[in-house]
Amino acid sequence: RRVLFRLGCSDVDPIMGVEVDPKDGFRAIGEPKALIQHNCDKYGWEVPGKNNEEPSQGWNEGPCVLKHNGRYYLQYAAPGTQYRIYGDGNYVGDNPLGPFEYVEDNPFSFKPGGFIGGAGHGHTFKDKYGNYWHVASMTISVRHWFERRLGLFPVVVSEKYGMYALTTFADYPFWIPDRKVDFEKEDISMGWNLLSYKKKISSSSYLEGYEPELANDEQVETWWAAQTGNAGEWLQIDLGKTMEVNAIQVNF
C-alpha cells in the first residue's frame, strides 16, 4: 500500500501532493508535485468576494481524494471559508498523483443561499450501505471570521452527470437511509415545510440589535438574544392558525 499526502492552503501556491513513508516518520518519497494551480481567470467560482467580485486570487485549500470506479477525484475548496459562495470542486485522473483534469461543471458542492450558506472545505465518504455523502463547512462569520458549522449532503455519482452534492433543500430535514439509495431517483426529504418564517413573534426581553424578529428571518447571521441568561426568559411564535408541527429546529 502507498500513503499519499496532499496539502495546500494559499492564495498563491498550488495544491501539492507527495508520497510519504509511514514507516520512516512519514518522510517524503521524492519531490512534492503541483496538482492544482490557481485559475481565477478561467473559473469564476474560484474568485473571492460575496458575489465572486473581488479582483484577487481566492484561496485553494482542503485537498482530499476519493477513488471511484478506478478513477481518482481530487477535491479542493475555494475561494474562502468566510463566504456563502464557498464550495468544493473536482479534478479527475487515473493516477493518485495525477495528472488531473478539471471537471467543467464545478463546483460540485455549492450552497450560496438559504438559512445557512457555504458548502466547501469538505470531504466525500461512503457509508456502510454504499451511499456517498459530502460533509462540508458552512459559514456564519459574525463573531469570528472563521465561525462555521458543518453540513451533510447526499451525493450523486452518475455516469451521465458526474458527481454532485444535493444541497438545494439542505436546510430542511431528511431521513438517513438504512439501505442503498439512488439519490438521483429517490427523494430522502421528509417533506416538511417551514411554518415559522417571519410569523408574528414576541419575547420576554431582548438586546438592541437582537430583536425577536431576528429569530425567524431564516438568516443564520442574525439571532434573538434575551437581556439575561436567567430562567424565565421566553420566545413565542404565533403561526396564525392551527398547524401540524412535526419538528422544532433550534439553532444556537
PLM features: residue spans?
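Short, small-residue-biased leader/transition segments that mark boundaries at the very start
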Residues: 2-4
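Short glycine/acidic-enriched loop and turn motifs that connect beta-strands
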Residues: 10-13, 79-82, 140-142
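Beta-propeller fold recognition
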Residues: 12-13, 18, 22, 26-38, ...
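Blade-edge beta-strand/turn elements of extracellular beta-propeller
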Residues: 22-56, 91-114, 160-170
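Loop/turn-rich, solvent-exposed surfaces of beta-rich toroidal or solenoidal domains
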Residues: 57-101, 109
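Disordered, acidic Ser/Thr/Pro-rich linker "stalks" and the adjacent N-terminal cap
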Residues: 177-242
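A short beta-strand element within beta-rich, extracytoplasmic domains
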Residues: 243-252
